[in-house]
Amino acid sequence: MNSYWLNVYKPRGISSAKLVSIIKKVLGKVKIGHSGTLDVEAEGVLPLAIGEATKLVQMLIDAKKTYIFTVKFGKQTDSGDYAGKVIAITDYIPSKENAYAICSKFIGTITQIPPAFSALKVNGVRAYKLARDGKEVELKPRNITIYDLKCLNYDEQNATATYYAECSKGTYIRTLAEDLALSLQSLGFVIELRRTQVGIFKEENSIRIDSFNDITKLSLEEKNIKIEAILDDILVLDANDEQAQKIKYGQKCLFDYDKNVDFMWVRYKGVLLTIGSLNKNCFHSLRVFNLTQ
């Protein structure tokens, strides 16, 4: 077994890269990828692609994600979360009614400017490294989509509100929290952030690691999720011996299927062989997988 998914829950206080390096050390010589960095101060679902599953990571990067986050009103920090230094203060705290009502304003496609403290690169350098050095960071605005946003709880005494968000790739929750606060004529920053779902991978089914010293290769492999799991709702065709050989050698391959398909996968002897598209019965391979039964 060398190609599968692991639905790992990243705890607060450790970087995504560090978590990957720990898992890699346990599993040995194997390629590992993940679906998108979680901030050190954040926690939650971090699906890991093992072996050939890394060829499907882009699908998870593009998938919808859900978060639960808590905003502290009245202050703004340079990083957008509690780890940063306070750069602005206001006495105005939004009402409970407004904290709930503002959500509808953000649902749909909106423009967002990524935070300076982010992993995006500026002239080859990570933005957060420039920001930490006190250098000015200019990042271009981008369009993102908020599919759902709702206030789950409002704590008047502590001036906080907890929100649930379902969003597209490229969404920065710290920026969303700041924009929510600004729209409420206040300031705010994130004090808690938890990613609850990435595509098919959900928080309730994730691997909780209480102690990294207790991780074993066997304990991880027992929690494996088959590589095809994220393809379950996508068209699949079965290849015969001749078709499979042509696909493996990058040759033209025809299927008896009348419709054009932008994205699909092909199975050979019950195992994922390739992903690609179909145009006028001709299959065009995007990725070929080296898997065995």
From Swiss-Prot:
Alphabetically, the GO molecular function entries are: RNA binding; tRNA pseudouridine(55) synthase activity
Q: Where is the active site?
A: 39 (nucleophile)
**Superkingdom as given in the UniProt entry:** Bacteria
Q: Pfam families under this entry? A: TruB_C_2, TruB_N
Does the record's keyword annotation contain tRNA processing? yes
What's its top-level EC category? isomerase
Q: Write down the EC number.
A: 5.4.99.25
Signal peptide feature range: none
Query: What keywords tag this UniProt record?
Result: Isomerase, tRNA processing
Q: Which family does it belong to?
A: Belongs to the pseudouridine synthase TruB family. Type 1 subfamily.
Reported function: Responsible for synthesis of pseudouridine from uracil-55 in the psi GC loop of transfer RNAs.
Name listed for the protein in its UniProt record? tRNA pseudouridine synthase B
